Amino acid sequence: MPNILTKKQAIEFLGTDEKIFDNYFKNAGEFKALPRQNNRGFFKFDQSELERWRDDYKWRTIELTFEDYAKCLDFALAQHFRGYVLSDWGTARQREFGQKITNWVKGQLAEVAVQKFFKNEFNKEVELDFKIYDDIVPQDIISVTDETGKRAPRIGVGIKSSKPKSAYLVLGENEISLEGRRSDVYIFCRPDMPDDHLLRLTKEKVIEAVQGQQHFPSYQDKMPDFQNMTCEIAGWCAVGELERVTSIPGQEFENGPRFVKKTGDLHRSREKWEELISQL
């Protein structure tokens, strides 16, 4: 007999929060509830299915070290100080420094995570491009090492990232419609990087600056330390498998359609990863 869990029990079993659970269940289709009579009543879940999902999630999740973070932060700062402008999707609003650096670091951490994932799980070495360019560079893997040595990839691979709660890989129309910006395959990652990473990095200096101030005692024991991060390699899809839409659950795209794939439909089994690696 299967062990049946309520939604609350399922959330506790997976050790996640309700918003992430709902996104993965309702929007992403990463796991299913048991059938309900006339689609009514409380959601219930088979524990064994959730366990399979959790185990699959764990083997695709990579630990990122301080050295990985430092490499990505260096790239982000180089981008910032060369005057590069990162705008919100489809708007002219510039993002403030903290958000801009955070987004760049997350993007690079995703690339490092894919590199480590390929090496750890499939013994495949790939090289990333951490150079700074004037134009957008669509391909994130610039070389592959095989029995003949180092060579250029046979296909273009774009590595995209978003927050852990994200249920969709989302790409702007120009990224797909313009041939010079399009990749053959997209890998989607969900790095779990705290928004206060810069505070964690500079904790000692911040304490030095504010200790003795009026409110310091109220938060001095709450300031977090820097810790290793994780990044889930959520899956991949070919460019032709993306869907052109004007909205996804909870979000209308204001400035034209986007190309998307919900994470539950991404390729993520070991066999599918081996298939992708054989194409590189």
Whereabouts are the PLM-identified features?
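Helix-turn-helix/winged-helix DNA-binding modules
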Residues: 2-3, 42
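Nucleic-acid endonuclease domains
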Residues: 12-15, 19-27, 48-138, 143-153, ...
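Well-ordered beta-strand positions in beta-sheet-rich domains
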Residues: 42, 154-156
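Short helix-start
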Residues: 32-57
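Residues within the helices of the helix-turn-helix
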Residues: 5-8
